[in-house]
Amino acid sequence: MHGHNRNGQAHVPRRKRRNRFVKKNGQCNVYFANLSNKSQRYMADIFTTCVDTRWRYMLMIFSAAFLVSWLFFGLLFWWIAFFHGDLEASPSVPAVGGPGGNGGESPNAPKPCIMHVNGFLGAFLFSVETQTTIGYGFRCVTEECPLAVIAVVVQSIVGCVIDSFMIGTIMAKMARPKKRAQTLLFSHHAVISVRDGKLCLMWRVGNLRKSHIVEAHVRAQLIKPYMTQEGEYLPLDQRDLNVGYDIGLDRIFLVSPIIIVHEIDEDSPLYGMGKEELESEDFEIVVILEGMVEATAMTTQARSSYLASEILWGHRFEPVVFEEKSHYKVDYSRFHKTYEVAGTPCCSARELQESKITVLPAPPPPPSAFCYENELALMSQEEEEMEEEAAAAAAVAAGLGLEAGSKEEAGIIRMLEFGSHLDLERMQAATLPLDNISYRRESRI
């Protein structure tokens, strides 16, 4: 039951706007919840986890890894020096051959495990110098403590592993084809208008770089809630929109902006949808552009989506490619602009198809029937002429007193036939109509 506002008008509650499944920038608006063993699964694939992590978090992780390793081995070196008694020695005793040393160290003085490490700060600095291979030459490990030598070897290996992992992750993250999708552009709106006599859904794609996308092809899917015949509710039912898979129109040469066309035919989910239905429908069209990056041969994918409110009925895109004197110019300031087309039908493609009444002319008679009718007419005309000639010959023969079947009668008949043929030729040359009797018989046929 609808409420009323203060003016007494009925208040119709507005339907909640549909959440995007795919955002305009291509990110999927999906949140995963209640995943069992999520941390263990992500740590099992630590490289992919680091590559997918944002830059700030990745740098924090590697910085923390370096600090932890330096602190751990610094504490280990301090512990070795402490138990060896190096920290109890006088800090003024110079190292053999070291800076400020004269090489005149007392032979009875104990030899430390790590030279010039007199506290935790010195051990930490030695750890940093060892792992980063700075090599100042002031602190060094002696052969007094094999444990300290082993610790130096282990720290060197750990440092190489961390460096390799960090460099590989950064390179993989920088070379990801996902960033190439940032220079692939989709129009802000999609349009529906008539093209080649049929309603078509169209949107525009473009490449902002001069480097090509190899084997570029497009796909489109319509996503909307769907209720099955058994009563099962599917909140995100996906249906393909044909953009020319069967004839290869889905593969494009993306040098300049191209308009992708989906013909709304009997197989299209938009076939029974008109302008009014479009404004009230709840669906989303996800468009996908895939191809290989020319520089790295890695597959990249760019995505975008259009809600029903972002589809303009009866509009077309403004042209962006213009032919100059020696080249073609692409004006990207017109990339998202459209203009309204007058006379675009507001009905659905189904209603438009049903309203087309095509009156086909009656097919002409086959050549065999035409010849047969003319043949009958000519045969009837020849029979009539032969009867008239025979009657005339009989009358002449009777007047001359000749017997039937004589040679003279046959000659007279041939003369009459010759005369009748001459008369017929004159009549055809003068394009005179046939006599009433032959015309009447022909019409009967």
Curated annotation (Swiss-Prot):
The chain crosses the membrane at residues 56-80, 148-169. It catalyses: K(+)(in) = K(+)(out). It is a multi-pass membrane protein. A motif (Selectivity filter) lies at residues 133-138. Changing E442A: Abolishes interaction with TAX1BP3. Highly expressed in the forebrain, moderately in skeletal muscle. Im olfactory bulb, specifically expressed at the postsynaptic membrane of dendritic spines of granule cells. A motif (PDZ-binding) lies at residues 443-445. InterPro entries: Ig_E-set, IRK_C, K_chnl_inward-rec_Kir, K_chnl_inward-rec_Kir2.3, K_chnl_inward-rec_Kir_cyto, Kir_TM. Residues 1-55, 170-445 are cytoplasmic. It is found in: Cell membrane; Postsynaptic cell membrane; Cytoplasmic vesicle membrane. Its main location: membrane. Changing S443 to A/D: Abolishes interaction with TAX1BP3. The record marks D163 as: Role in the control of polyamine-mediated channel gating and in the blocking by intracellular magnesium. Belongs to the inward rectifier-type potassium channel (TC 1.A.2.1) family. KCNJ4 subfamily. Homomultimeric and heteromultimeric association with KCNJ2 and KCNJ12. Interacts with DLG2 and DLG4. Associates, via its PDZ-recognition domain, with a complex containing LIN7A, LIN7B, LIN7C, DLG1, CASK and APBA1. Interacts with TAX1BP3. TAX1BP3 competes with LIN7 family members for KCNJ4 binding. Inward rectifier potassium channels are characterized by a greater tendency to allow potassium to flow into the cell rather than out of it. Their voltage dependence is regulated by the concentration of extracellular potassium; as external potassium is raised, the voltage range of the channel opening shifts to more positive voltages. The inward rectification is mainly due to the blockage of outward current by internal magnesium. Can be blocked by extracellular barium and cesium. This is Inward rectifier potassium channel 4. It comes from Mus musculus (Mouse).
